[in-house]
């Protein structure tokens, strides 16, 4: 059955317009980007198959556009829609940060770190530098590889913060395994970083660990007090 033959209230586009995007499942949202399904399938079933065979969602959406075109059911047009949607989401979050709006909403900052780091196949440690009104100055990826206490150099974070004349920083790194739970090494290096930044009167506002699902916030857990 084609989606056009579905009851109106069950069609993804009509459902989105009537109830908002949050009312749709992952497959229904993807179906809107897919447009039309494979022969003999509707777009929702094609989207479900994509998630089943090439998911989870983060791995599917974070693929480069050229890689998406090689998946069944996704031609160049759909692949470009996927890539454009992800880039728009990232730019929206950065725009909010630049206007100083998102820092009153810590989950938005966590989502921004997720957008930047989640798809990496290796660990990346990044820093968001902020002015004295907590507006974004710059976002930099400072360390890559296997992140542990020996790989993060607090002096380099301090040096870059002073170069940007930053009053505060938010840091984040990803766990390619998908498990966002901080390790003991993560906690140890965060303590070293906190102590180093305090020496030059720069605040460490949060440390996000990125994996599948919601980022883990050190500030939310009370680990920066």
Curated annotation (Swiss-Prot):
Gene3D superfamilies cross-referenced by the UniProt entry: Cytidine Deaminase, domain 2
Q: Domain of life here?
A: Bacteria
Q: Which GO terms describe its molecular function?
A: metal ion binding; metallopeptidase activity
Q: In chain numbering, where does the motif JAMM motif fall?
A: 173-186
Q: Which SUPFAM superfamilies does the annotation name?
A: RuvA domain 2-like
Q: Provide the residue positions that the database annotates as binding Zn(2+).
A: 173, 175, 186
Q: What GO terms describe the biological role, i.e. biological process, of this protein?
A: proteolysis
User: Which keywords does UniProt give here?
Assistant: Hydrolase, Metal-binding, Metalloprotease, Protease, Zinc
Cysteine-cysteine disulfides: none
Domain named MPN: which ranges?
A: 102-224
- InterPro entries in the cross-refs: MPN (IPR037518), RadC_JAB (IPR025657), RuvA_2-like (IPR010994), UPF0758 (IPR001405), UPF0758_CS (IPR020891), UPF0758_N (IPR046778)
Tell me which family the UniProt entry assigns to this protein. Belongs to the UPF0758 family.
Would you tell me the protein name for this molecule? UPF0758 protein XAC3915
């Amino acid at each position: 059955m084609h989606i056009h033959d579905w009851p109106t209230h069950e069609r993804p586009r009509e459902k989105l317009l009537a109830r908002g995007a949050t009312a749709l499942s992952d497959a229904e949202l993807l179906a809107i980007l897919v447009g039309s399904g494979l022969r003999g399938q509707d777009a929702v079933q094609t989207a479900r198959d994509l998630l089943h065979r090439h998911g989870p969602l983060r791995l599917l959406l974070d693929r480069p556009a050229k890689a998406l075109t090689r998946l069944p059911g996704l031609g160049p047009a759909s692949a470009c829609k996927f890539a454009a949607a992800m880039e728009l989401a990232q730019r929206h979050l950065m725009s909010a940060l630049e206007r100083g709006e998102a820092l009153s909403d810590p989950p938005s900052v966590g989502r921004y770190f997720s957008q930047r780091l989640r798809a990496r196949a290796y660990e990346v440690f990044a820093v968001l530098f902020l002015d004295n009104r907590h507006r974004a100055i710059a976002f930099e990826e400072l360390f890559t590889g296997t992140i542990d206490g020996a790989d993060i150099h607090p002096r380099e974070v301090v040096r870059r913060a002073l170069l940007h004349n930053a009053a505060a920083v938010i840091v984040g790194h990803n766990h390619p395994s998908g498990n966002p739970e901080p390790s003991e090494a993560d906690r140890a290096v965060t303590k070293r970083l906190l102590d180093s930044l305090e020496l030059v009167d720069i605040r460490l506002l949060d440390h996000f660990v990125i994996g599948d699902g919601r980022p883990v916030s050190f500030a939310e857990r009370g680990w920066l007090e």
